[in-house]
Amino acid sequence: HGGTAVGTGRGDQLNPALARGRFDWVLVPSDEGLSTPVVYARLDALRDAEGALADDPPLSLEVPAPVLQALRSGDPDLLSESIYNDLQEAALHERPELETTILRGIHAGALQGIVSGSGPTVALLCASPEGAQEVQSLLREHGLESLHVHGPVPGARILA
């Protein structure tokens, strides 16, 4: 299908979300993996330390309205103010150098940076294609390879 979607469950249940405009991202993969079970265990430990209890109400699986509004508006600045990842703090505990990558990206001009999923890939939201190219160039100076991607894009299509 392509486009923008909201993933729930294990990310396998997708529902389309309206997104206008173009969002440019710089993805910074890592040579070293990060175990998803380890990140979730760290998240549980962090929540336990904060006093979260097993019988607390479950976290909402709904996408916050500001995120959906930002996608509909096509405004990367607005999106940068509302994106977050519940797993990021746990991932950064396991791999603190990912925070350095995020900060380098923001210093290079990215609007915002987050850990993608349970990591270790870092996703840097940029204001424009030119901004993304500048971020890539400055990250390269620090020995970090990256990919410039944009969305939303259509899914696979048969051309014949």
Question: Would you name each region that the model predicts?
Answer:
Residues 2, 7-112, 148-160:
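Conserved, helical-rich catalytic subdomain that frames metal- and/or nucleotide-binding sites
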Residues 29, 123-127:
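Short hydrophobic/aromatic beta-strand micro-patches
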Residues 39-41, 127, 136-137:
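Short amphipathic alpha-helical segments
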Residues 114-115, 124:
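Conserved SAM-binding loop
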Residues 130-160:
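RNase H-like, two-metal
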